[in-house]
Amino acid sequence: MASTGRIPLWIIATFGGIAALTVVGLFIYGSYSGIGSAL
């Protein structure tokens, strides 16, 4: 968090949002393909 002043907040928010959507998408895809049941 020391370099927060050098990194724009919207970049962090965008990256966090994409990462969250990717994780949710993987869980949904895993549940449909049967991999999510093993987690």
Curated annotation (Swiss-Prot):
PSII is composed of 1 copy each of membrane proteins PsbA, PsbB, PsbC, PsbD, PsbE, PsbF, PsbH, PsbI, PsbJ, PsbK, PsbL, PsbM, PsbT, PsbX, PsbY, PsbZ, Psb30/Ycf12, at least 3 peripheral proteins of the oxygen-evolving complex and a large number of cofactors. It forms dimeric complexes. The keyword Iron does not apply. It is a single-pass membrane protein. One of the components of the core complex of photosystem II (PSII). PSII is a light-driven water:plastoquinone oxidoreductase that uses light energy to abstract electrons from H(2)O, generating O(2) and a proton gradient subsequently used for ATP formation. It consists of a core antenna complex that captures photons, and an electron transfer chain that converts photonic excitation into a charge separation. The chain crosses the membrane at residues 9-29. Belongs to the PsbJ family. Keywords: Chloroplast, Membrane, Photosynthesis, Photosystem II, Plastid, Reaction center, Thylakoid, Transmembrane, Transmembrane helix. It is found in: Plastid, Chloroplast thylakoid membrane. GO terms for biological process: photosynthesis. The gene is psbJ. It holds the Pfam family PsbJ. GO terms for cellular component: chloroplast thylakoid membrane; photosystem II reaction center. This is Photosystem II reaction center protein J. The keyword Transmembrane helix applies. It comes from the Eukaryota. SUPFAM superfamilies: Photosystem II reaction center protein J, PsbJ.
